[in-house]
UniProtKB/Swiss-Prot annotation:
Lipid bilayer topology: Multi-pass membrane protein
PANTHER family for the chain: CYTOCHROME C OXIDASE ASSEMBLY PROTEIN COX18, MITOCHONDRIAL, OXA1
Gene Ontology CC terms, in alphabetical order: plasma membrane
Protein name: Membrane protein insertase YidC 1
Keywords from the named record: Cell membrane, Chaperone, Lipoprotein, Membrane, Palmitate, Protein transport, Signal, Transmembrane, Transmembrane helix, Transport
Family listed: Belongs to the OXA1/ALB3/YidC family. Type 2 subfamily.
Pfam families: 60KD_IMP
InterPro entries per UniProt: YidC/ALB3/OXA1/COX18, YidC/Oxa/ALB_C, YidC/YidC1/YidC2_Firmicutes, YidC_ALB_C
Originating organism: Streptococcus agalactiae serotype V (strain ATCC BAA-611 / 2603 V/R)
Cellular localization per UniProt: Cell membrane
Lipidated sites in chain (S-diacylglycerol cysteine): C21
Length: 271
Protein backbone atom coordinates (compact mmCIF):
# COMPACT_ATOMS: atom_id res chain seq x y z
CA UNK A 1 0.00 0.00 0.00
CA UNK A 2 2.81 2.34 0.92
CA UNK A 3 4.61 1.74 -2.38
CA UNK A 4 1.41 2.25 -4.36
CA UNK A 5 0.75 5.60 -2.70
CA UNK A 6 4.31 6.73 -3.31
CA UNK A 7 4.06 5.69 -6.96
CA UNK A 8 0.72 7.48 -7.33
CA UNK A 9 2.16 10.65 -5.82
CA UNK A 10 5.17 10.47 -8.13
CA UNK A 11 2.94 10.02 -11.18
CA UNK A 12 0.83 13.02 -10.20
CA UNK A 13 3.89 15.17 -9.62
CA UNK A 14 5.55 14.13 -12.87
CA UNK A 15 2.32 14.62 -14.77
CA UNK A 16 1.89 18.14 -13.41
CA UNK A 17 5.41 19.08 -14.49
CA UNK A 18 5.07 17.49 -17.94
CA UNK A 19 1.83 19.34 -18.60
CA UNK A 20 3.56 22.57 -17.68
CA UNK A 21 6.80 22.10 -19.57
CA UNK A 22 5.94 23.95 -22.81
CA UNK A 23 8.35 26.64 -23.95
CA UNK A 24 6.53 28.43 -26.75
CA UNK A 25 4.97 31.88 -26.59
CA UNK A 26 1.63 32.04 -24.78
CA UNK A 27 -1.12 34.45 -25.84
CA UNK A 28 -4.89 34.84 -25.66
CA UNK A 29 -5.09 32.60 -28.76
CA UNK A 30 -3.21 29.68 -27.20
CA UNK A 31 -5.12 26.43 -27.57
CA UNK A 32 -4.42 24.33 -24.48
CA UNK A 33 -6.12 24.69 -21.10
CA UNK A 34 -2.74 24.93 -19.36
CA UNK A 35 -1.64 27.83 -21.58
CA UNK A 36 -4.92 29.62 -20.93
CA UNK A 37 -4.26 29.30 -17.18
CA UNK A 38 -0.75 30.67 -17.69
CA UNK A 39 -2.16 33.57 -19.72
CA UNK A 40 -4.78 34.30 -17.02
CA UNK A 41 -1.95 34.54 -14.48
CA UNK A 42 -0.11 36.92 -16.80
CA UNK A 43 -3.17 39.17 -17.23
CA UNK A 44 -3.61 39.24 -13.44
CA UNK A 45 -0.03 40.42 -13.04
CA UNK A 46 -0.60 43.07 -15.71
CA UNK A 47 -3.77 44.26 -13.92
CA UNK A 48 -1.78 44.65 -10.68
CA UNK A 49 0.98 46.59 -12.45
CA UNK A 50 0.03 50.05 -11.20
CA UNK A 51 1.59 52.88 -13.23
CA UNK A 52 2.56 50.19 -15.76
CA UNK A 53 5.16 48.78 -13.36
CA UNK A 54 5.37 45.09 -14.27
CA UNK A 55 7.86 44.61 -11.44
CA UNK A 56 5.28 45.83 -8.91
CA UNK A 57 2.67 43.56 -10.50
CA UNK A 58 5.00 40.56 -10.14
CA UNK A 59 5.58 41.37 -6.46
CA UNK A 60 1.89 41.88 -5.63
CA UNK A 61 0.64 38.82 -7.52
CA UNK A 62 3.35 36.60 -6.01
CA UNK A 63 2.41 37.78 -2.51
CA UNK A 64 -1.31 37.19 -3.17
CA UNK A 65 -0.71 33.66 -4.49
CA UNK A 66 1.59 32.77 -1.60
CA UNK A 67 -0.91 34.18 0.93
CA UNK A 68 -3.77 32.15 -0.57
CA UNK A 69 -1.66 29.00 -0.31
CA UNK A 70 -0.61 29.61 3.31
CA UNK A 71 -3.15 27.11 4.75
CA UNK A 72 -1.81 24.41 2.44
CA UNK A 73 1.74 25.27 3.40
CA UNK A 74 0.83 25.17 7.08
CA UNK A 75 -0.81 21.76 6.67
CA UNK A 76 2.26 20.46 4.87
CA UNK A 77 4.70 21.77 7.48
CA UNK A 78 2.69 20.49 10.46
CA UNK A 79 2.48 17.04 8.92
CA UNK A 80 6.22 17.04 8.21
CA UNK A 81 6.91 18.17 11.77
CA UNK A 82 4.82 15.33 13.24
CA UNK A 83 6.66 12.82 11.07
CA UNK A 84 10.00 14.19 12.29
CA UNK A 85 8.89 13.88 15.92
CA UNK A 86 8.17 10.17 15.62
CA UNK A 87 11.23 9.30 13.49
CA UNK A 88 13.27 7.98 16.48
CA UNK A 89 10.42 5.64 17.43
CA UNK A 90 10.03 4.48 13.83
CA UNK A 91 13.72 3.61 13.73
CA UNK A 92 13.31 1.57 16.91
CA UNK A 93 10.53 -0.39 15.23
CA UNK A 94 12.73 -0.98 12.19
CA UNK A 95 15.44 -2.37 14.46
CA UNK A 96 12.86 -4.54 16.21
CA UNK A 97 11.73 -6.03 12.88
CA UNK A 98 14.85 -6.06 10.67
CA UNK A 99 15.32 -7.59 7.24
CA UNK A 100 12.85 -8.36 4.47
CA UNK A 101 11.17 -11.35 6.05
CA UNK A 102 7.45 -11.18 5.12
CA UNK A 103 6.31 -11.74 8.72
CA UNK A 104 8.63 -9.02 10.02
CA UNK A 105 7.54 -6.61 7.27
CA UNK A 106 3.89 -7.26 8.11
CA UNK A 107 4.44 -6.75 11.85
CA UNK A 108 6.47 -3.60 11.17
CA UNK A 109 3.74 -2.17 8.96
CA UNK A 110 1.03 -2.99 11.52
CA UNK A 111 2.92 -1.32 14.37
CA UNK A 112 3.75 1.70 12.22
CA UNK A 113 0.09 2.13 11.28
CA UNK A 114 -0.89 1.84 14.95
CA UNK A 115 1.67 4.51 15.85
CA UNK A 116 0.42 6.82 13.07
CA UNK A 117 -3.16 6.40 14.32
CA UNK A 118 -2.23 6.98 17.97
CA UNK A 119 -0.24 10.12 17.14
CA UNK A 120 -2.73 11.44 14.58
CA UNK A 121 -0.13 11.31 11.81
CA UNK A 122 -0.82 10.74 8.13
CA UNK A 123 2.52 10.08 6.39
CA UNK A 124 1.07 11.29 3.08
CA UNK A 125 -0.62 14.44 4.36
CA UNK A 126 2.43 16.52 3.42
CA UNK A 127 2.35 15.27 -0.19
CA UNK A 128 -1.10 16.43 -1.28
CA UNK A 129 -0.64 20.13 -0.38
CA UNK A 130 2.67 20.07 -2.26
CA UNK A 131 1.02 18.56 -5.34
CA UNK A 132 -1.56 21.35 -5.29
CA UNK A 133 1.03 24.09 -4.81
CA UNK A 134 3.44 23.01 -7.53
CA UNK A 135 1.18 23.55 -10.59
CA UNK A 136 0.14 26.97 -9.28
CA UNK A 137 3.71 28.13 -8.70
CA UNK A 138 4.78 26.65 -12.03
CA UNK A 139 1.99 28.50 -13.84
CA UNK A 140 3.21 31.73 -12.27
CA UNK A 141 6.78 30.97 -13.35
CA UNK A 142 5.68 30.21 -16.92
CA UNK A 143 3.62 33.39 -17.08
CA UNK A 144 6.85 35.31 -16.52
CA UNK A 145 8.81 33.36 -19.12
CA UNK A 146 6.27 32.69 -21.89
CA UNK A 147 4.04 35.79 -22.09
CA UNK A 148 5.54 38.66 -24.08
CA UNK A 149 4.07 41.65 -22.21
CA UNK A 150 5.61 40.45 -18.92
CA UNK A 151 9.09 40.34 -20.43
CA UNK A 152 9.29 44.10 -20.90
CA UNK A 153 9.51 47.02 -18.54
CA UNK A 154 11.77 48.09 -15.73
CA UNK A 155 11.80 47.84 -11.96
CA UNK A 156 14.15 50.04 -9.93
CA UNK A 157 16.19 50.69 -13.09
CA UNK A 158 16.44 46.94 -13.88
CA UNK A 159 15.34 45.68 -17.30
CA UNK A 160 12.99 42.82 -16.41
CA UNK A 161 13.74 41.00 -19.67
CA UNK A 162 17.50 41.00 -18.99
CA UNK A 163 19.71 39.45 -16.27
CA UNK A 164 20.51 41.73 -13.34
CA UNK A 165 23.88 43.34 -14.21
CA UNK A 166 24.47 44.29 -10.56
CA UNK A 167 23.72 40.75 -9.22
CA UNK A 168 21.52 42.23 -6.48
CA UNK A 169 18.47 40.05 -7.21
CA UNK A 170 20.47 36.79 -7.61
CA UNK A 171 22.16 37.37 -4.25
CA UNK A 172 18.82 38.18 -2.56
CA UNK A 173 17.15 35.14 -4.14
CA UNK A 174 19.96 32.88 -2.92
CA UNK A 175 19.94 34.48 0.55
CA UNK A 176 16.21 33.98 1.09
CA UNK A 177 16.44 30.44 -0.30
CA UNK A 178 19.15 29.69 2.26
CA UNK A 179 17.17 31.24 5.12
CA UNK A 180 13.97 29.36 4.28
CA UNK A 181 15.80 26.02 3.98
CA UNK A 182 17.90 26.64 7.10
CA UNK A 183 14.88 27.62 9.20
CA UNK A 184 12.88 24.63 7.94
CA UNK A 185 15.65 22.20 8.89
CA UNK A 186 16.65 23.87 12.16
CA UNK A 187 13.94 22.15 14.19
CA UNK A 188 14.54 18.73 12.64
CA UNK A 189 14.77 16.04 15.31
CA UNK A 190 17.56 14.27 13.46
CA UNK A 191 20.03 16.05 11.20
CA UNK A 192 21.50 14.15 8.27
CA UNK A 193 23.77 14.76 5.31
CA UNK A 194 20.84 15.21 2.90
CA UNK A 195 19.36 18.07 4.95
CA UNK A 196 22.75 19.74 5.31
CA UNK A 197 23.45 19.48 1.58
CA UNK A 198 20.02 20.87 0.73
CA UNK A 199 20.61 23.86 2.99
CA UNK A 200 23.71 24.91 1.09
CA UNK A 201 23.35 23.40 -2.39
CA UNK A 202 19.91 24.85 -3.21
CA UNK A 203 20.93 28.50 -2.57
CA UNK A 204 24.06 27.94 -4.65
CA UNK A 205 22.01 26.55 -7.55
CA UNK A 206 19.59 29.49 -7.32
CA UNK A 207 22.51 31.94 -7.26
CA UNK A 208 24.25 30.48 -10.31
CA UNK A 209 21.11 30.04 -12.43
CA UNK A 210 19.86 33.53 -11.53
CA UNK A 211 22.86 35.10 -13.25
CA UNK A 212 21.41 34.08 -16.63
CA UNK A 213 17.67 34.43 -15.97
CA UNK A 214 15.61 37.50 -16.76
CA UNK A 215 15.32 39.87 -13.81
CA UNK A 216 11.53 39.46 -13.76
CA UNK A 217 11.87 35.74 -13.02
CA UNK A 218 14.55 36.30 -10.37
CA UNK A 219 12.36 39.00 -8.78
CA UNK A 220 9.61 36.38 -8.46
CA UNK A 221 12.05 33.91 -6.86
CA UNK A 222 13.24 36.57 -4.42
CA UNK A 223 9.76 37.64 -3.33
CA UNK A 224 8.48 34.06 -3.14
CA UNK A 225 11.36 32.86 -0.95
CA UNK A 226 11.22 35.99 1.22
CA UNK A 227 7.53 35.30 1.84
CA UNK A 228 8.37 31.70 2.69
CA UNK A 229 10.80 32.91 5.37
CA UNK A 230 7.96 35.03 6.78
CA UNK A 231 5.61 32.01 6.69
CA UNK A 232 8.06 29.80 8.56
CA UNK A 233 8.65 32.37 11.30
CA UNK A 234 4.91 33.03 11.63
CA UNK A 235 3.43 29.53 11.41
CA UNK A 236 6.24 27.06 12.10
CA UNK A 237 8.83 29.04 14.03
CA UNK A 238 11.69 26.58 14.68
CA UNK A 239 12.76 28.41 17.84
CA UNK A 240 9.28 27.94 19.33
CA UNK A 241 9.21 24.29 18.24
CA UNK A 242 12.59 23.64 19.87
CA UNK A 243 11.48 25.44 23.05
CA UNK A 244 8.27 23.38 23.28
CA UNK A 245 10.21 20.18 22.64
CA UNK A 246 12.78 21.00 25.33
CA UNK A 247 10.00 21.86 27.79
CA UNK A 248 8.31 18.53 27.09
CA UNK A 249 11.59 16.71 27.74
CA UNK A 250 12.06 18.65 30.99
CA UNK A 251 8.55 17.84 32.20
CA UNK A 252 8.98 14.17 31.31
CA UNK A 253 12.33 14.08 33.15
CA UNK A 254 10.82 15.69 36.27
CA UNK A 255 7.94 13.22 36.20
CA UNK A 256 10.40 10.33 35.94
CA UNK A 257 12.39 11.68 38.88
CA UNK A 258 9.24 12.02 41.01
CA UNK A 259 8.30 8.42 40.24
CA UNK A 260 11.79 7.24 41.22
CA UNK A 261 11.68 9.19 44.49
CA UNK A 262 8.24 7.80 45.29
CA UNK A 263 9.49 4.26 44.68
CA UNK A 264 12.52 4.81 46.92
CA UNK A 265 10.29 6.14 49.74
CA UNK A 266 7.94 3.19 49.37
CA UNK A 267 10.89 0.81 49.46
CA UNK A 268 12.27 2.40 52.67
CA UNK A 269 8.88 2.15 54.39
CA UNK A 270 8.65 -1.56 53.62
CA UNK A 271 12.07 -2.05 55.23
Amino acid sequence: MKKKLKTFSLILLTGSLLVACGRGEVSSHSATLWEQIVYAFAKSIQWLSFNHSIGLGIILFTLIIRAIMMPLYNMQMKSSQKMQEIQPRLKELQKKYPGKDPDNRLKLNDEMQSMYKAEGVNPYASVLPLLIQLPVLWALFQALTRVSFLKVGTFLSLELSQPDPYYILPVLAALFTFLSTWLTNKAAVEKNIALTLMTYVMPFIILVTSFNFASGVVLYWTVSNAFQVFQILLLNNPYKIIKVREEAVRVAHEKEQRVKRAKRKASKKRK
